[in-house]
């Protein structure tokens, strides 16, 4: 889902060394990314540019699936300066049958669904969020000591 939705065009998955950028200062990671970080990845997504945040450790920084669902549904509710498009095709609006779904996205204001309806992620939306939550390269490696500054 990450590749299919083109996330790698704007997001990278590598933390640059302190001498090469401010990734560590931005708290995107505590150490640089090294080749061993990608050893078990089926596909490596280094990225083609970095218009958005680096996602190497996004699963460490953000642990709530709701945060990702709200971001994907309407990025501008998270930040007005973001250039990320909405990925609303990863969601469906449906009538509430009995109780709300545990997966219902908590939306407010103009983007909230009408009364009696809820916005829920599709299986593709859930898969993308599960992938993003899994991005955690915060384990120690001898060839990339953590920066303590």
Give the positions of each predicted feature:
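Sequence/structural segment immediately N-terminal to covalent heme-attachment motifs in c-type
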Residues: 1-13
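Flexible coil segments in periplasmic/lumen-exposed cytochrome c-class electron-transfer proteins
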Residues: 12-50, 60-65, 70, 74-149
């Amino acid at each position: 889902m990450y590749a299919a939705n083109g996330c790698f065009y704007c997001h990278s998955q590598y933390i640059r060394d302190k001498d090469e950028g401010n990734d560590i200062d931005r708290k995107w990671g505590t150490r640089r990314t090294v080749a061993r970080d990608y050893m078990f990845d089926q596909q490596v997504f280094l990225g083609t540019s970095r218009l958005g945040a680096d996602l190497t450790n996004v699963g460490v920084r953000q642990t709530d699936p709701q945060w990702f669902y709200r971001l994907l549904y309407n990025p501008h509710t998270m930040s007005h300066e973001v250039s990320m498009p909405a990925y609303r095709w990863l969601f469906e609006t449906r009538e509430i049958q009995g109780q709300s779904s545990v997966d219902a996205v908590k939306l407010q204001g103009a983007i909230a669904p009408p009364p009696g309806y809820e916005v829920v992620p599709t299986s593709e939306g859930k898969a993308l969020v599960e992938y993003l939550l899994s991005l955690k390269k915060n384990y120690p490696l001898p060839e990339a000591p953590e920066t303590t500054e």
